[in-house]
Amino acid sequence: MYRLWRFTPWLTRLILGAATLIFTLIGLKYITDPVGAAASFKISLGSAAAITSMRVGFGAFPLGFAIVVASCLMSTSRLLPGLYFMATIIGVATAARVLGIVVDGAAPESVFLLRPEVALLALSVVGVLLESGRRRHQRTHTA
């Protein structure tokens, strides 16, 4: 079990690193090509304000999330808050996706995106459990 606790910070960093990469790619996609990104979901942007809103709502927020999560990679003491942040963001996004599927119907695009969201949510929860366990183990074995 000691081995697991020793490698937990690196496993959780891997999880946070994956989230950082995903949030960055999503953010950059919508900031650099909001019209193309929206068109892939059959959304048309009919004005400059609509394009800017797409850049901000779908690009800037995920990029901001990426920066927050990346900053949590730098210190072992910030791993758990980063994992909680990630679980919260992905959990809310997954819940909204499920709500959309229930209310609006199971569009293939929505179902396709649900899989990686659920996987990322599961990874973040596993990360929270591992890091919490590591901290508990550390407290009981150093006191």
Predicted regions and their residues:
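Non-cytosolic membrane-interface motifs at loop->transmembrane helix junctions
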Residues: 106-117
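Membrane-water interface at the C-terminal end of transmembrane alpha helices
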Residues: 120-139, 143
